[in-house]
Amino acid sequence: MPRLWPWVLLGLVALEGARGKKRFRPLTYPRITNKTFIGQYVDIHNRLRSEVQPPAADMLHMTWDLALARTARAWGQKCIFQHNHFTKIKGAGHPDPNLHPVGENIWFGHARRVPFNSSNAIYSWYSDKDFYDYQDNSCSQVCRRYKQVVRASTYKVGCAVVFCRRLDRHRNTEYFVCNYGPTDTYPSRPYKTGQPCSACPEGDTCQDYLCRNSSRDKIYIKRYSRWYPPWEHRLICDDSCIVLAVLRPSLTLLAFVVVYCLQKRYPDLMLQTETV
């Protein structure tokens, strides 16, 4: 027994040290389906797209996409500040081939105990316009983030924000990821310049200097409700799965209770099998 005292003291010291060093606890971040969160970043994207200089003749209006948001969340939860290489694989970033290839922008900041605001990230991406020359289609510094925000052919966006205890060498960060579909892998200009909406696809209408189409702008929920990025390895359990998971142990427990009660009530009761 006396030999245990050193270990007990060591455990108490470790416990006291753990109490002394409190871990940072951030606010709860919005879910990818949070309407306020979605409305904020979609509206900012569309406003910035409508204000490009020189003006865009073929800039499409953006709407939210569930599958892209799930891809953004899955990558963000890995807490790796690099671009998602899976989006280059057909079907790995979005199930709809018409939205391939999938584009991406990433941002991180120090986590704070205030509600997350996506405008800081999106404006930082858009500020890359200072390094972009439209006439020469050249960048004096990195400007791919700006070109992705104002890519005219992109009409779907989905974003996610997650808390990372450690992101590379940084601690306690909020990691914001946006995925876009479709993007353009060619080093072309992000849009055609000209009178706003003068080069919209046939059948489109013009609203706030952006090309709109009710079919293209439709938001699909049920279509992608069962889709998750195949590289996420997410454990998925639908309603029937949940019922089975709850029902099976409940019935097993009930059977055990019934047998136990019968044996207590009728101690001489024997379950026999007929032999031939």
Task: For every predicted segment, state its role.
Residues 2-276:
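Mature extracellular or exoplasmic CAP/SCP-family domains and secreted bioactive peptides
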